């Protein structure tokens, strides 16, 4: 009579399944769903069931978020396509990484970190600092992501707490490590403007950035505050604002304008702007970075970092994120 029929079998361990249809008529046969699960005895770790790649081929900017915990405020992931709908954010079919935004939410995004090496012209934006990657050199798990950036010959690992992102980079060659922090321009679902960054220590930064351009709802402007710690002192900090670059700085303040590209579309244009943290590193050396965020003030971002991730034990945070 057309109503749904559910057939449940008693639990049984098997190596092969065969389905035979006895009451259908060739091409008119309809089958809505078959669910087959591994034996629970073989998978006591329920997190191992999770496949973060699901819906990463035609999803949205905020669908694939490996650097996040359930109900956590921090939500980082590599970005391969800088758009929202129809395969934006991390897309499994892509071959290039444009950066690692720290915020992936509905109509909220920003604070893009890009580990690189050598002399980078940041005024070219993400097309100037992007890197090729391969799934053969990638590991994706809930709360953890590892990927090799081919153009820079370095490994990037990321994990997180509820409000802090934790990165560990390993360099396979002697190099000038060039870690870019982009705080300007369109990213996924909103546009970053009016960035402000200050150096507060030999290996510390703090600042804020405004996000605008939300077509599908939300406040006119949302400000994100952040505190950023490196585990090695800076050799030098450089900055850029649109087409202007400056060497040996202690901060950056940008007054940028976001303009709608097309009326009625969730896309605003604004120049890129940010900071480059430079370190001279040897082959095999690691560089670690922590970024804490807050939507209220810098003091709370600093509190989040001290309360949730006061140490430099990356693997401990990774294990805790998997629980």
Locations of regions flagged by a protein language model:
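Aromatic, loop-rich ligand-recognition surfaces of beta-strand-rich domains
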Residues: 1-43
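Accessory carbohydrate-recognition regions in carbohydrate-active enzymes
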Residues: 40-323
């Amino acid at each position: 009579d057309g109503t749904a029929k559910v057939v449940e079998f008693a639990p049984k361990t098997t190596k092969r399944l065969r389905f035979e249809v006895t009451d259908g008529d060739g091409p008119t046969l309809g089958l809505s769903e078959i669910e087959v699960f591994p034996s629970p005895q073989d998978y006591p770790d329920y997190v191992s069931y999770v496949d973060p790649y699901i819906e990463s081929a035609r999803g949205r900017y905020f669908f694939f978020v490996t650097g996040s915990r359930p109900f956590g405020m921090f939500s980082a992931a590599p970005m391969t396509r800088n758009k929202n709908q129809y395969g934006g954010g991390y897309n499994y079919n892509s071959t290039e990484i444009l950066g690692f935004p720290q915020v992936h939410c509905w109509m909220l995004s920003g604070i893009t970190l890009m580990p690189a090496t050598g002399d980078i012209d940041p005024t070219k934006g993400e097309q100037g600092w992007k890197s090729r990657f391969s799934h053969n050199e990638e590991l994706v798990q809930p709360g953890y992501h590892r990927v090799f950036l081919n153009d820079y010959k370095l490994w990037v690992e990321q994990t997180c707490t509820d409000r802090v992102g934790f990165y560990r980079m390993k360099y396979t060659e002697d190099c000038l490590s060039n870690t870019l922090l982009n705080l300007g321009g369109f990213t996924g679902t909103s546009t970053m403007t009016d960035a402000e960054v200050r150096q507060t220590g030999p290996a510390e930064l703090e600042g804020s950035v405004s996000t605008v351009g939300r077509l599908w709802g939300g406040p006119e402007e949302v400000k994100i505050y952040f505190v950023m710690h490196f585990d090695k002192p800076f050799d030098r900090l450089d900055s850029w604002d649109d087409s202007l670059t400056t060497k040996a700085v202690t901060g950056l303040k940008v007054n940028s304008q976001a303009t709608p590209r097309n009326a009625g579309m969730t896309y605003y244009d604004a120049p890129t702007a940010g900071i480059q943290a430079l370190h001279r590193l040897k082959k095999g050396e690691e560089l670690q970075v922590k970024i804490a965020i807050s939507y209220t003030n810098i003091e709370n971002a600093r509190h989040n970092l001290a309360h949730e991730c006061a140490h430099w034990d990356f693997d401990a945070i990774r294990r805790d994120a998997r629980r």
